Amino acid sequence: MGIKNKFFLNDSLLIDISTGDITLQGLGEYQEKLKMDERLPKIRKILSITRDANVKFSLKEMFLYVEILKKTTSDTNIRWAILTSTPSVTAFASLIELDKLFQNKVLICSTLETATRFLQIQITESDLQSSDFKQF
C-alpha cells in the first residue's frame, strides 16, 4: 500500500493518493500520522485519489473503520471527494458516503472534473503528478 499526500493551505485542501492494496492496518497508520500534523485543522476539503487502489479488508472491517472514522472526525464541516475506479474502493467509499454523519459531505466520483466541481477547487491531472507529495 502506498499513500502520499499534499496540503494546499491556500485552498484549505488536502489531497491524498492511494495505490496498491489498502489494508485496515495501513489505513489506520496513515490516519494516526495525519492526525499529528498541525496543518490538519485548517483543512475543509479533502480529495482522495484511489483509482489505482484496492481495498483488502472484509466488509465487517469496513464497517468498523467507518465507526472509527466517525469517532475521530471532530470537524464534520468538511467536503470530501473520493475519486475511484475500482469496485472494492467504491463499496468502501459508499459506506462512508451513506453514513448520516457524512451525508452531503462526501461524494464518490469517477472523474477528476466531478471531484473538483464538488470541492470547488482548481486541480489538474498534472498537479497530481507533482514530486512534492509526501510519501507515507
Where are these regions (language model features)?
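Amphipathic, Lys/Arg-enriched alpha-helical "gate/interface" segment within cytosolic domains
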Residues: 1-136
